[in-house]
Amino acid sequence: MARNIPLERVRNIGIAAHIDAGKTTTTERILFYSGVIHKIGEVHEGNTVTDWMAQERERGITITAAAITTAWTRRDPENPTQPLPGALEHKINIIDTPGHVDFTIEVERSMRVLDGVITVLCSVGGVQPQTETVWRQANRYNVPRFIFVNKMDRTGANFYKVYSQVRDRLRANAVPIQLPIGAEDTLSGIVDLVGMKAYVYGNDIGTDIRVEEIPADMEELVQEYRAKLIEAVSETDDVLLEKYFGGEELTEAEIKAALRKGTVANTIVPMLCGSAFKNKGVQQMLDAVLDYLPSPLDIPPIKGLLPNGTEVERSADDSQPLSALAFKIMADPYGRLTFVRVYSGILQKGSYALNASKDKKERISRLIVLKADDRIEVDELRAGDLGAVVGLKDTFTGDTLCTEDSPVILESLFIPEPVISVAIEPKTKADLDKLSKALQSLSEEDPTFRVHVDQETNQTIIAGMGELHLEILVDRMLREFKVEANVGAPQVAYRETIRKAVNNVEGLYKRQTGGKGQYGHVVINLEPGEPGTGFEFVSKIVGGVVPKEYIGPAEQGMKERCESGVIAGYPLIDVKVTMVDGSYHDVDSSEMAFKIAGSLALREAAQKAQPVLLEPMMKVEVEVSGDFLGDVMGDLNARRGQIESMDNEGGVSKVTSRVPLAEMFGYATDIRSKTQGRGTFSMEFSHYEEVPRNVAETIIAKNKGNA
């Protein structure tokens, strides 16, 4: 079957930002103007298309990355409510992502599979902590983007302040290509710095847009920002640079081509403005998606590994062998949905694909594309497409689907570690099986949600990215799986590590009491690893002193010992083990004996290597009026916080600090009472840091039952 729309007219984009910047409203307007919906939904009314989970509609926040397909034809610059005569339709796949830090994995997995991003910023709040997190995630995957400064109709709106923040805090080469005409309740339109026109809105529903001369009182400002635009685009191309230095005018086509080149190369970040809620600037933003964000053909080929470890590239081409990345799992009444991005080749309904990550064959029984909760069945997904496969059994987030005769494994996703855990149990014994099924289903969907059983207490422990994250998952158990659960108090996800290296530590397991005995013997070196490496194992066994079949079990024993640590029962991380020697017995040695020997060696070595306790540190930003600043800072210090910076703007102080997560439980209530309800804060995971000795002693004693 031929492709309906050629790849150069396809855009895979995400809409990402800080919570409350207006992402979901912006998406709704895009869907309205592109004809997917015929009535605009509002977040505050709980009837938006992309927020389709019950909790999303109740809370007014986006939790899961909803994927939607729509289409857009470039507007006529002289008649902006109508398509440009002769312009061709483009297909746009949109992912609306959450802005709440507890759901950061949804942003992470979206960035991994997108070609471009619209970053929505609030014209009042500007760059917020979660904006910086989203920006870093986009940087990690080198995703081209532009900025839409939203809510220009709100009191306190300031486009130029946001422009400065983007350059200073995000260190981005932001280039405004539009300026607002007016602000707050006088917002009446936008100036297009590329076409040098003013678009003035006759109403708040986006159906009456007039093209006018640029207002006389803006002439100087427009010339200043037009000059910045021309300078920025000239630097993308030697020919344009020559024209610029020669004092020649650049044509509109040259400016657009250079802007596209700079945006795709991530050297320019265009800035647009408007008000999604008041329907101002949305059509122009959609034109910018077509003009400046890349098609699948514009991005570099995806890199992967062949089974022998050789690096290979796959480009966006239907004729190449299939390669697709699973980026999201979702439980659904129709069956388990596995969302995929097809990077090359064609994924066909009724065919078989190899899950190269697990080396298992999967049958592709049904393929669908989504319009939020509408599912449209399709026969195939081609290179550059986003869609979902129904009913895959062994494929999870980060796995690669390919053909058996051309296997490849694509780079997976970065999955952050959980920072908070709680014990959970069903309210009635009858619900035990249902709870187990619910936890399995939810952990398959969300790789940052972990479930394990505490070996000592036999309690089921769930771990996640924050209190809201776990609260919503428990809520989903009740709604979707009809399981009522009791949840314990939140616990901090402490970790253990070591501070010095130790060499030649032995682990000997010997049981010889007549008959077949047990014998395993290993010698290891243990040293601190790089932060974030977890557990690293190297074997330097030579000459067969330990047979190959026993090295794996010894490593497994060490890994399992790391899971329960050596000082307080928390996982031991960022260690490098080198197995240097050992011995075996022809009759008595076994895999189990070497597994136990490995565990004994690791425990002995870690106890000698100056083990320490680590705790998650959170980046906390508090905004408060000056009257309460002293109380807030005193409180942060009392919570073992480290104040990093303070800014004051318009009578509001912003305090940035790093505070241990253990000290932040209940902070939302405390700050409300300390500031009479006028203080706000945001918190996100920063890093792990060593726990002060006096605090560590209390935690260790408590875990040993001595507290």
Swiss-Prot record:
Residues 8-297 form the tr-type G domain. Pfam families: EFG_C, EFG_III, EFG_IV, GTP_EFTU, GTP_EFTU_D2. One of its GO terms (cellular component) is cytoplasm. SMART domains: EFG_C, EFG_IV. GO terms for molecular function: GTP binding; GTPase activity; translation elongation factor activity. Disulfide bonds: none annotated. The keyword Lipid metabolism does not apply. GTP binds at residues 17-24, 96-100, 150-153. It comes from the Bacteria. One of its GO terms (biological process) is ribosome disassembly. Its main location: cytoplasm. It is found in: Cytoplasm. This is Elongation factor G. The gene is fusA.
